[in-house]
């Protein structure tokens, strides 16, 4: 049986994946920018917001880097890469993923 926090993270990832799939099928919705040899898209931010919103609904006291305007103090911190493989996504190469992890007092727990 999957643990509750992992189950909630999986649901958040699925919600983000739906948005990625929608945008992947509609390249006209993707805005691409680059800096320092890195590629960024609007989809990265949109998916991050979807995932953080889903997780924050269940865990409002947890810390979400890039999602918290002011750094809160909590033992739980979520690490989110909303679109791992952005270059592939931007080039319409279907090799990309969502990565979500949770740490407790600096140690990976999920």
Predicted regions and their residues:
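DPxDG-like acidic metal-binding loop motif
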Residues: 74-110
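N-terminal subdomain of lithium-sensitive/metallo-dependent phosphomonoesterases centered on the IMPase/IPPase/PAP
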Residues: 1-83
């Amino acid at each position: 049986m999957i643990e509750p926090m992992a189950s909630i993270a999986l649901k958040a990832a699925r919600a983000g994946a739906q948005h990625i799939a929608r945008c992947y099928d509609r390249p006209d919705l993707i805005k691409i920018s680059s800096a320092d040899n890195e590629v960024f898209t609007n989809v990265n931010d949109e998916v991050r917001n979807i995932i953080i919103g889903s997780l924050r609904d269940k865990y409002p006291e947890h810390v979400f880097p890039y999602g918290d305007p002011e750094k809160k103090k909590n033992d739980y911190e979520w690490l989110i890469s909303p679109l791992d493989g952005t270059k592939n996504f931007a080039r319409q190469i279907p090799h990309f993923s969502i990565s979500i992890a949770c740490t407790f007092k600096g140690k990976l727990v999920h």
